[in-house]
């Protein structure tokens, strides 16, 4: 072992020299004896060696390198359940453990290089510049991240923005890796800002299945190739859970290949879900494009009843606003006097289900609760880039609404619509086949409250009936660790619950846990679309817990009334902190800097061509109309049970709408290849297979009253023409089977002798012209977004050969 250790010590020195060009032998002659390689190598134990090297680098004023190695040490000694390796100085390290330590040293030092290559952002300023328009919270974050650094933006602006983090699951990475390969494997922007979590499909019970093994291998390959600093492997956490708890910081801009990326908005950062190809580009380039959306303001007022958390609050908001109404394709900003009663965990649940409102994302104005939450983190690097913004008093919102938290009670969202919300008492006694407490919506706070509800039931003599299934899945291993510390896992088990590994479990229904067709489930998850989880109804974790004893829908109020709320508050810890419990000090809010001269361009990629020749359209697009309705969701377009086999457009098309519109595919083959639909087409998840399935069927164009935000971006990325047509006269003329002609050059639709004008955005035009986002990157490289967002009259012309849609698994 000593020989292995000495070799590892030499390798650490070599990594330092090769990665950061630091040679300790190049120090002054006075320091050589003290800081020589031989001196360092004499330390006993690899971790002791690292500790000495950290101190030496600090003394030699290599502060960043010293800090990086200090972080490596913290990761090494942290318990596995808290994201570490669980090592200690007193034990000899096995060869595999030494190899992992060396990997971390290499990865964290390489992170300094990627940070050096990144474009610096100008410091924010203390006050609003004179004459600048009033901005919303989200507009300020966009303005701060805009590459041009104008210091302001307005709705409708097409801008390039720097991205702070990219996040993906093992399932969505499968498609992103394909896109990455199609781009020529150009490398990623920052190896310390890619959060990759195994949660959607992987499960210890099915790891041996080849398709699951392939997902694991792809993620492990990403870890090695990119030298990821933040990789925790499979079933450590649900994608959003530990990212929000330990990484997202106020003021950041985060892009993720999952529709519930919006969850991190709880901390005052802008977190937006997109499709796999759309997310791969900022992973590579460090930037993306945004057409600045409108925002709505929801002011939370009143005081919630004890035991009412974020899940019931967002169900109430869904009841009041409904899907695809005022929040559709807009950012939802939460503020108001009532937020002081909502913990960070409660805010997380509310932002999480902004996706079900059809909003782009949700975001809370940061406050002292936010600050206290972030301050509790383990690593300094994840709490030292905080920037607090708040909306101006004269900010312009598309709508401003009040929600009274005093009106919130235990609610029940009936299958198959998350906005079909009624009080639990209206359906009390409904027979259930399964009770599930889990999914990303369900926070640590929710699990603790569910355990206390179960505890009250057990004290009253309630016992679980023999029939039915009960499953509790924690959002992460740190949460499970906390529940064990609080002696609450035993409560779940005593109440008949099986405790699973962290993952999406029954929510997405792609892994070992799947509801049987026809079963009636009660779940604390976020989505209950048709063909997703049997007949799934949505409630809070407390309601699931109360209902689990008799397998009948039960209002939890009686059991909630028996809880000792002082104990409840003590158990919640920092994740359940509210304003009344936190230090009453003021935050320092800042403003985006107006520094256009500060803008720096990144080096161009070496894999693109400067050719600008663009052939004209060969003629109008013709076909026959196939009518569909409102809310055609991604679960219907690309059913979850077939996603792992959807490697190509053709494979995806085999199952398009087969559950909801079984004749759709055959009619497409018969020439009904122009879809005309209603509101919110493509709502639901970020999965690109929904677009791939339409392309694979032979659909040439989708015309709708409105599209879901992510789906609308996915269409031009993959080469499917999507047209938003608000004109009601068009729908009066568009009969099923009608002949239609679409002139893309003139942007006109001809039908039944009538003429209807449509518009494509500048970015849509550019992507169509170049054949999709992959082809555009091959042409422009890292200057892709600069080229396609440049202020110019793009016009439209013939699409180049469509890019091959990647095999992506997103939810």
Swiss-Prot record:
Q: Which UniProt keywords apply?
A: Iron, Iron-sulfur, Lyase, Metal-binding
User: What InterPro entries does the record tag this protein with?
Assistant: Acnase/IPM_dHydase_lsu_aba_1/3 (IPR015931), Acoase/IPM_deHydtase_lsu_aba (IPR001030), Aconitase/3IPM_dehydase_swvl (IPR015928), Aconitase_4Fe-4S_dom (IPR036008), AconitaseA/IPMdHydase_ssu_swvl (IPR000573), IPM_dehydratase_rel_enz (IPR050067), IPMI_Swivel (IPR033940), LeuD_type2/HacB/DmdB (IPR011827)
List of residues binding [4Fe-4S] cluster = 440, 504, 507
Pfam families this protein is in? Aconitase, Aconitase_C
The GO molecular function terms of this record are: hydro-lyase activity; iron-sulfur cluster binding; metal ion binding
The record ties this protein, via CDD domains, to: IPMI_Swivel
UniProt keyword annotation of Iron present: yes
Q: Which residues does the record give as substrate binding sites?
A: 258-260, 527, 532, 686-687
Q: Give the residue range of the signal peptide.
A: none
Q: What turns on expression?
A: Very low expression levels near the detection limit.
SUPFAM superfamilies given for it? Answer: Aconitase iron-sulfur domain, LeuD/IlvD-like
Name one process (GO BP) from the record: L-amino acid biosynthetic process
The enzyme's E.C. designation: 4.2.1.-
Recorded family membership: Belongs to the aconitase/IPM isomerase family.
Q: Which protein, by its recorded name, is this?
A: Putative aconitate hydratase
Q: Which organism is it from?
A: Aspergillus fumigatus (strain ATCC MYA-4609 / CBS 101355 / FGSC A1100 / Af293)
Gene symbol here is acoC
């Amino acid at each position: 072992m000593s020989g292995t250790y000495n070799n590892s010590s030499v390798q650490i020195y070599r990594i330092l020299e090769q990665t950061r060009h630091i040679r300790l032998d190049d120090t002054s002659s006075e320091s050589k004896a003290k800081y020589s390689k031989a001196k360092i190598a004499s330390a006993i134990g690899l971790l002791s060696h690292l500790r000495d090297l950290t101190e030496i680098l600090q003394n030699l004023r290599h502060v960043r390198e010293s800090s990086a190695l200090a972080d490596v040490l913290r990761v090494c000694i942290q318990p596995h359940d808290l994201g570490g390796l669980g090592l200690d100085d007193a034990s000899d390290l096995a060869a595999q453990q030494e190899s992992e330590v060396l990997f971390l040293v290499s990865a964290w030092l390489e992170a300094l290089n990627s940070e050096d290559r990144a474009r610096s952002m100008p410091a924010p300023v203390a006050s609003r510049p004179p004459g600048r328009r009033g901005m919303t919270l989200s507009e300020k974050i966009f303005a701060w991240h805009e590459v041009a650094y104008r210091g302001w933006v307005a709705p409708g602006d097409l801008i390039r923005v720097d991205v702070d983090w990219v996040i993906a699951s093992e399932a969505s990475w499968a498609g992103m890796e394909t896109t990455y390969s199609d781009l020529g494997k150009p490398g990623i922007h920052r190896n310390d800002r890619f959060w990759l979590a195994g949660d959607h499909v992987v499960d210890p019970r099915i790891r041996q299945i080849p398709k699951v093994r392939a997902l694991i291998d792809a993620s492990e390959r990403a870890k090695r190739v990119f030298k990821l600093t933040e990789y925790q492997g499979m079933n450590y956490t649900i994608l959003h859970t530990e990212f929000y708890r330990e990484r997202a910081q106020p003021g950041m801009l985060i892009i993720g290949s999952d529709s519930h990326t919006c969850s991190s908005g709880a901390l005052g950062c802008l977190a937006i879900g997109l499709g796999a190809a759309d997310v791969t580009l900022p992973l590579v380039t460090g930037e993306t494009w945004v057409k600045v959306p409108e925002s709505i303001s929801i002011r939370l007022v009143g005081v919630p009843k004890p035991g009412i958390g974020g899940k019931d609050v967002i169900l109430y908001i869904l009841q009041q606003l409904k899907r695809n109404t005022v929040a559709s394709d807009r950012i939802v900003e939460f503020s108001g006097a009532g937020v002081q009663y909502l913990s960070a965990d409660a805010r997380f649940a509310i932002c999480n289900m902004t996706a079900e409102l059809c909003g782009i994302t949700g975001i809370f104005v940061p406050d002292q609760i936010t600050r206290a939450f972030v301050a509790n983190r383990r690593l300094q690097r994840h709490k030292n880039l905080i920037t607090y913004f708040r909306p101006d008093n004269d900010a312009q919102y598309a709508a401003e609404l009040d929600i009274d938290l005093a009106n919130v009670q235990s609610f029940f969202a009936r299958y198959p619509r998350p906005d079909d919300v009624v009080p639990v008492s209206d359906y009390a006694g409904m027979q259930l086949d399964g009770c599930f407490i889990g999914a990303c919506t369900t926070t640590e706070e929710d699990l603790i409250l569910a355990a206390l509800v179960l505890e009250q039931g057990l004290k009253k003599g309630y016992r679980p009936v023999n029939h039915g299934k009960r499953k509790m899945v924690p959002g992460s291993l740190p949460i499970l660790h906390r529940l064990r510390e609080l002696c609450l896992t035993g409560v779940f088990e005593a109440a008949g619950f099986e405790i699973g590994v962290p993952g999406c479990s029954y929510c997405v229904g792609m892994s070992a846990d799947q509801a049987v067709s026809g079963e009636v489930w009660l779940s604390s998850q976020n989505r209950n679309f048709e063909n997703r989880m049997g007949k799934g109804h949505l409630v809070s974790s407390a309601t699931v817990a109360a209902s689990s004893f008799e397998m009948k829908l039960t209002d939890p109020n009686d059991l909630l009334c028996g809880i000792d709320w002082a104990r409840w508050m003590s158990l919640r810890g920092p994740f359940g902190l509210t304003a009344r419990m936190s230090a009453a000090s003021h935050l320092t809010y800042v403003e985006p800097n107006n520094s256009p001269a500060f803008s720096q361009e990144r080096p161009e990629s070496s894999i693109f061509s400067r050719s600008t020749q663009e052939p004209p359209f060969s003629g109008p697009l013709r076909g026959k109309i196939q009518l569909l309705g409102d809310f055609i969701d991604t679960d219907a377009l690309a059913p979850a049970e077939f996603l792992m086999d959807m490697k190509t457009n053709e494979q995806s098309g085999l199952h398009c709408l087969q559950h909801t519109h079984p004749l759709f595919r055959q009619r497409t083959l018969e020439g009904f290849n122009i879809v005309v639909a209603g509101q919110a087409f493509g709502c639901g998840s970020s999965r690109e297979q929904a677009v791939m399935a339409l392309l694979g069927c032979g659909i040439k164009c989708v015309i709708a009253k409105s599209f879901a935000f992510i789906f609308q971006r996915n269409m031009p990325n993959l080469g499917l023409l999507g047209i938003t047509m608000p004109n009601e006269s068009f729908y009066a003329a568009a009969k099923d089977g009608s002949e239609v002609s679409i002139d893309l050059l003139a942007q006109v639709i001809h039908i039944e002798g009538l003429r209807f004008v449509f518009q494509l955005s500048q970015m849509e035009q550019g992507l169509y012209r170049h054949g999709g986002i992959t082809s555009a990157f091959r042409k422009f490289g890292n200057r892709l977004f600069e080229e396609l967002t440049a202020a110019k009259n793009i016009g439209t012309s013939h699409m180049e050969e469509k890019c091959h849609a990647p095999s992506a698994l997103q939810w």
